[in-house]
Regions:
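Glycine-centered hinge/linker elements that transmit conformational signals in sensory
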Residues: 162-167, 210-242, 285, 289
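Extracytoplasmic/periplasmic substrate-recognition and gating elements
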Residues: 38, 42, 123, 147, ...
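Long, aromatic- and glycine/proline-rich binding clefts that accommodate carbohydrate-like moieties
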Residues: 109-110, 114, 281-288, 335-387, ...
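Extracytoplasmic "Venus flytrap"/periplasmic binding protein-like
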Residues: 35-112, 146-148, 153-156, 251-252, ...
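Short, solvent-exposed loop/beta-turn-alpha elements that line the ligand-binding surface or hinge
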Residues: 96-111, 154, 172-173, 179-186, ...
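Conserved C-terminal helix/tail region of periplasmic/extracytoplasmic solute-binding proteins
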Residues: 145, 151, 367-427
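Hinge/lid segment of periplasmic solute-binding proteins
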Residues: 80-136, 191, 281-290, 351-355, ...
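Extracytoplasmic/periplasmic solute-binding protein
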Residues: 118-130, 135, 159-214, 258
Length: 427
């Protein structure tokens, strides 16, 4: 945890200090976030801002403790799936009608992201979207070219995607054998995010329409889970990949070990920081999720900014939240972090889209972005989903019982049973 004080004009003992908690959205957030808000601070003499950088591993506990005690920052960043829980705890200040009017009632932001500033089935908006995580297929253009695979066809639908993986699997490029696809297995934080788009594109969902029950056992969801699992059963995802987490696999993809990986815009930072002339840096592109029977939606998440309920400086905190929710600061943050802006106009700004062709493609893919229902119980629900669905990796890798559709269905049944208990207890 790192804290840094930023002062506007000449600091005085009587200066009003705002406390701001953020996550490490850039590689040096302790420097970059104060630099991002420096113009706002300069325009507000007598105000100082203390920026504290939390980490994703311990941030949840610190934020929930603050919400429970009403002792915390004036404003803070919240992951989009965290926000409903903290709002439901009474930890966030809802935006007033006047404040909502100042941000045009959310019109500048992607609708799916604006939805995450609310609590499902309840009135009230608790913040503004700050930056976005949109998922896409990152693939090696040199691998596809050597295998004679047309990327446009490869990502057209599920069958063509599987056919393309079969053709690139095991191909040798530049003296290195390349596995077709990387996705993480047991206990990885991306388990649900990786699987959800396949479920949506099959016509299924992670929850029922009223968000009161799990929907993983519908025929559509089961079809998607089976297709996704069969990629590993067939060997298109190496069994050792299923034992690794997303961070390790992303590094291995950048190192040239895999042909395809589904990831988010942060991977661009890793690619662009690779040594000049590296294989992947010179030979990669992105594509949307292969279309299923019901489209090619992708996971859409990110982070929001909110005012802490216990703040004694809510007006000043809102002014800073509103500033950071503006177009220019969001474009600037995207250039610092490689995360996509949460505003539609910022995500289409040439400063972002022309930085690299992939950024423009991510903006286009975001048009099909889809967020989870903003329920307070998402945290414990995701833990259940991650635990059970992560165990599919053991089945597909042949550890213990071998994969079969009945075994998969039994595992999903257990998942749904436990998930429904979590949802029932949360009501």
């Amino acid at each position: 945890m790192v804290a840094l004080l930023l002062a506007g004009g000449v600091a005085k003992a009587s200066a009003l200090e705002l406390s701001m908690w953020v996550m490490p959205v850039t590689t040096n957030a302790a420097h970059d976030i104060p630099a991002l808000i420096a113009p706002w601070v300069a325009a507000h003499p007598g105000l100082t801002v203390r920026v504290t950088v939390l980490d994703w591993e311990s941030g949840w506990n610190k934020i929930t403790a603050a919400a429970a005690s009403r002792r915390g920052p004036d404003l803070l960043e919240l992951g989009s799936t965290w926000m409903p829980a903290i709002a439901a705890m009474g930890g966030l200040e809802p935006l007033s009608a006047a404040q909502l009017a100042e941000v045009d009632n959310g019109a500048p932001y992607y609708p799916q992201l604006w939805k995450t500033t609310q609590v499902f089935g309840r009135p009230g908006v608790y913040g503004v979207p700050w930056y976005a995580d949109v998922r896409a297929a990152f693939y090696r253009t040199d691998v596809f070219r050597q295998a004679g695979v047309d990327p446009a066809r490869a990502f057209a639908d599920w069958q063509s995607f599987r056919d393309a993986l079969r053709r690139i699997n095991g191909i040798t490029v530049g003296g290195k054998r390349v596995a077709a696809l990387a996705y993480a297995g047991k206990n990885d934080w991306n388990v649900v995010h990786n699987l959800a788009p396949w479920i949506w594109n099959a016509g299924g969902d992670v929850l029922t329409a009223d968000a009161r029950h799990s929907a993983l056992d519908t025929p559509q969801a089961l079809r998607a889970i089976d297709f996704y699992s069969q990629l590993a059963v067939e060997g298109l995802v190496p069994s050792n990949a299923l034992e690794k987490d997303s961070d390790i696999l992303e590094g291995a993809w950048v190192g040239g070990d895999y042909g395809v990986i589904f990831s988010g815009p942060w991977l661009m930072r890793r690619i662009l920081e690779a040594p000049a002339g590296s294989v992947v840096r010179e030979h990669f592109d992105v594509a949307p999720y292969p279309a299923g029977p019901h489209g090619h939606a992708t996971f859409f998440g990110g982070s929001n900014l909110a005012i802490f309920k216990g703040s004694r400086h809510k007006a000043e905190a809102w002014d800073l939240v509103k500033y950071l929710g503006g177009k220019a600061p969001q474009v600037r943050l995207s250039l610092l972090s490689s995360m996509m802006p949460a505003r539609v106009d910022a995500a289409n700004d040439p400063a972002w889209t022309s930085r690299h062709p992939v950024f423009a493609k991510l903006t286009a893919i975001a048009a099909d972005g889809r967020a989870y229902p903003p329920i307070p119980a998402w945290g414990p629900l995701e833990t259940v989903y991650t635990k059970h669905l992560g165990q599919l990796a053991e089945l597909t890798a042949g550890i213990g019982d071998k994969y079969s559709e009945p075994a998969m269905r039994a595992m999903v049944h257990d998942t749904v049973t436990e998930a429904n208990k979590v949802l029932e207890e949360a009501e």
